[in-house]
Amino acid sequence: MKLEDAKIKYIHTWGSLATSWGINKTMAQVHALLLVSTVALSADEIMETLKISRGNVNMNVRALIDWGIVRKEFVAGERKEFFVADKDIWELFKQVTKERKKREIEPVLKVLDELQKDVNENEEGVEEFKKLMSDLSSVTNTVNGILDRAIKADEHWLLSNFTKMIKK
C-alpha cells in the first residue's frame, strides 16, 4: 500500500472509530489528517483533502484547539492560518485524558455530591438513594484518581502498572 493510501485509510478509520468514543467523526478525521501531515496545513488544504466545508473545518479546528491537541503555526510569508497537531502520542493521551476528566468526570462528581446533600430526608427510599449516590461517587472518585495519576505519570510507569494489573 502506498503511503498516501495508508494515510487516507488511517484518517477514515480513525474517524469511524471515534464515534464509538463519543467524538465527532469529522473532528477525528481533521485531527488524524493533522497528525499524519508532515507540514502545517491551512483550512483550505484540510477542506480539499477531507472534502468538507470551510465552516466544518473552522468549527472542528477550533474545538481541537480548545482540547489542546492542535495549535496554530505561523508560516512566514503567508496570511492564512496554519494548523498542526502534536506528534507525541503519550502527550496526546494525557491531554485528552485531562480534558475528558474536566468535561465528563468532574461534572458527574459535582452532581453526585449535590444529590447526596440536597435530597429531601423525609421521603421513603432516601437512604437507599443516598447510598447509591455515595457508591457511584466512590467509584467515580477512584476513576478520577487513576486518571490524575495517568496524567502526571510518564509513559513507562503507566504501561508497567497497567501490564501488572492485567497479569493478575
Each model region followed by its residue ranges:
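A short acidic, leucine-rich amphipathic alpha-helix
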Residues: 45-48, 64
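C-terminal regulatory/oligomerization modules of transcriptional regulators
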Residues: 117-168
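Short, cationic-aromatic polyanion-contact patches
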Residues: 18-26, 42, 75-96
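Glycine-centered, phosphate/nucleic-acid-interacting loop/turn motifs that mediate DNA/RNA or nucleotide
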Residues: 68
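Amphipathic alpha-helical dimerization/coiled-coil segments
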Residues: 89-135
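Short, Lys/Arg-enriched N-terminal segment that forms or immediately precedes the first helix
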Residues: 8-20
